[in-house]
Amino acid sequence: HQLTPEVENTFWVNLIGRGYPAPRHKFRWCTERLKIKPSNAFILNVVRANGEAILVLGTRKAESSVRRHRMEKLEGDRVRDRLSPNGSLPNSLVYSPIEDWSNDDVWLYLMQSSNPWGYNNKDLLAMYAGASEDNECPLVVDTSTPSCGDSRFGCWTCTLVDKDKSMSAMIQNDEEKEWMLPLLELRNDLDITDDRHLRDFRRMSGKVQLFHDRPIHGPYTEDARHDWLQRLLEAQTWIRSNG
């Protein structure tokens, strides 16, 4: 199953249509709408049809200290080895078979096993290598040396990180990836620190919200949203011709 958000919850409908400012850690409106709601709706449908659901996830403690802490916190509620209750959805469990694997464990398995849907895993390795700054993907025993598993792929519009290092490296290391340059430029322009000159004081309802008797900036202005739409369409046209 390929899950997608409802049209009213898609990224550009909210940013251009409703004028939501680019996501920030204090206003992270994207994750709930784009990822969590579609997933939860699908899981609830499975539970209704079958009485329960088990999610098989590739989450690993080695991904980050935050991920390790969250996973270890849930271990006390396990019903059996690697099988934990889903805290947000009743009658659903989370199975994490590779939770203790390192990055190198993952790559060693992929290089030694065939892909069930027919793609060559070496192409995947090459893609991760291209997303690293030195264009390499070493399998290492020295934990101070980063492996290619540290390359991260998320939404190309993501403004929750300072820089999209993976996309930048892919463009730099591979001429065939230069078609992504308009996307990177658009993403970087969305990620401006001070966007107050692009935003209106009025909410969609027409109301003005105050904080200590001073108006708070609200959605993007109509002119700003028109500019984002024009630039997005220009990037789309260029990519269709050159990508």
Predicted regions and their residues:
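Nucleotide-activated chemistry modules centered on ATP-dependent adenylation/adenylyltransferase
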Residues: 1-243
